[in-house]
A protein has these predicted regions:
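Acidic, small-residue rich beta-repeat scaffolds with periodic aromatic anchors
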Residues: 18-88, 93-94, 201-298
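Beta-propeller blade termini
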Residues: 87-95, 137-146, 188-200
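Blade-edge motifs of beta-propeller repeat domains
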Residues: 60-82, 118-136, 177-191, 195-203, ...
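C-terminal motif of bacterial Sec signal peptides marking the signal peptidase cleavage site
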Residues: 14-16
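Short, solvent-exposed loop/turn segments at conserved positions within beta-propeller repeat blades
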Residues: 107-111, 163-167, 207-209
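Acidic/hydrophobic-patterned starts of short beta strands in beta-sheet-rich repeat architectures
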Residues: 97-105, 147-158, 197-201
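Beta-propeller blade repeat segments, especially FG-GAP/WD-type strand-to-loop junctions
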Residues: 116-122, 165-183, 214-219
Length: 298
């Protein structure tokens, strides 16, 4: 008799667990606004809705969000092993944009995918953004006010390859009125200063040749403020501040500086700018000066 009651109790527990699981795993709905796919330059755009493996990866991620998100910010990662190659996914959930709940999904499979969804009622997720790049690029997403207008924006940063120090940051400004993201703004080796509404950074190119730059958010757009280049006449001991973009500026094209302005000293890539090579010929210096002489601008 005790065995009968024990078996009955086990059945009740199993039924209760299944019932609870059913409550937790509600069927979700995924909607998509009319959005433009954005991608890295060397990656072909694709429609992930026709790829069953990618659909599984994204659906699994959003299903987890639907179960776990209770209104508090949430960040976690997991391995999705039902695909080959195995997918690693990082999920961030919170009231990131306009105090509304959003999900950022960063997943690696055959490509690197970053998607943004707005969480709506009745287990519904509405896609607002889609980015794709090579799986070899470790694209990092972050959310902050890039242009100093008091509204959070989406940033995607990845480390480039090669000898020219190419580390781009893509900025997508969020518009709370339309709940959409802007076209991509690209900055090289950038540091952001939202309180000043300024971006400062180091250009991509040969060390000791490339310049510093500063852009300011004015009237709804990024406006170039100045460039600072090593002064080739003094072998990089001094610098030239100019409004003209381009290596090896002449002194008459700008202001001669005896030192780098303090506002640039904290840039994370400043060391690349300072690597001036005095032991060998600077790249394309002779050609640049000859061309300038021919144009009568020396």
């Amino acid at each position: 008799m005790k065995k009968v009651f024990l078996l009955y109790g086990i059945c009740l527990c199993l039924f209760a667990c299944r019932e609870q699981s059913g409550k937790e795993q509600q069927r979700i709905t995924i909607l998509q606004d009319s959005i433009k796919t954005t991608s890295a330059e060397d990656v072909e755009e694709k429609d992930i809705t026709v790829d069953p493996q990618l659909v599984k990866i994204i659906t699994e991620a959003l299903q987890r969000v639907d179960t776990l998100y209770k209104g508090e910010d949430l960040t976690y990662s997991y391995i999705y092993s039902d695909t080959l190659p195995i997918s690693e996914t990082i999920i961030k959930v919170g009231k990131f944009f306009d105090q509304q709940p959003y999900v950022v999904v960063n997943s690696t499979w055959e490509d690197r995918l970053i998607e943004v969804y707005k969480i709506e009622q009745n287990h519904t997720f509405r896609k607002k953004f889609f980015y794709i790049s090579s799986w070899m690029e470790f694209a990092r997403d972050s959310i902050f006010d890039a242009n100093g207008d008091g509204i959070n924006d989406l940033s995607i940063t990845w480390s480039g390859t090669g000898a020219l120090n190419y580390n781009p940051t893509y900025i997508y400004l969020f518009d709370p009125k339309t709940e959409t993201f802007s076209e991509r703004y690209e900055f090289e080796n950038a540091d952001f200063f939202p309180k000043e509404q300024v971006v400062r950074g180091v250009q991509t190119g040969f060390s000791g040749v490339v310049g510093l730059y500063k852009y300011k958010w004015i009237g709804g757009q990024w406006v170039a403020q100045e460039y600072i280049y090593p002064d080739y006449i003094s072998n990089g001991k001094y610098f030239i501040r100019t409004q003209k973009e381009g290596p090896y500026p002449s002194r008459k094209d700008g202001e001669l500086l005896l030192k780098i302005p303090e506002e640039y000293l904290g840039l994370k890539d400043l060391s690349w700018f300072l690597m001036y090579d005095t032991d060998s010929e600077l790249p394309f210096l002779r050609e640049t000066l000859e061309e300038r002489k021919m144009e009568g601008n020396k």
